[in-house]
Curated annotation (Swiss-Prot):
Family: Belongs to the short scorpion toxin superfamily. Potassium channel inhibitor family. Alpha-KTx 03 subfamily.
Note: Negative results: has no effect on rat Kv1.4/KCNA4, Kv1.5/KCNA5, Kv4.1/KCND1 or human Kv11.1/KCNH2 and Kv3.1/KCNC1.
GO molecular function: potassium channel inhibitor activity; toxin activity
Lysine amide modification, residue list: 37
Protein name: Potassium channel toxin alpha-KTx 3.13
Keywords: Amidation, Disulfide bond, Ion channel impairing toxin, Neurotoxin, Potassium channel impairing toxin, Secreted, Toxin, Voltage-gated potassium channel impairing toxin
SUPFAM superfamilies: Scorpion toxin-like
An annotated GO cellular component: extracellular region
């Protein structure tokens, strides 16, 4: 699930994905992509 959070590497997406109610995420094309629960 893509969210509108810019990133350079996947570690930057852990907190935004948690805040969005999802488990974890990776950085894809400069934006965070989260895994739903």
């Amino acid at each position: 699930v893509g969210i509108n959070v810019k990133c350079k590497h996947s570690g930057q997406c852990l907190k935004p994905c948690k805040d969005a109610g999802m488990r974890f995420g990776k950085c894809m094309n400069g934006k965070c992509d989260c895994t739903p629960k």
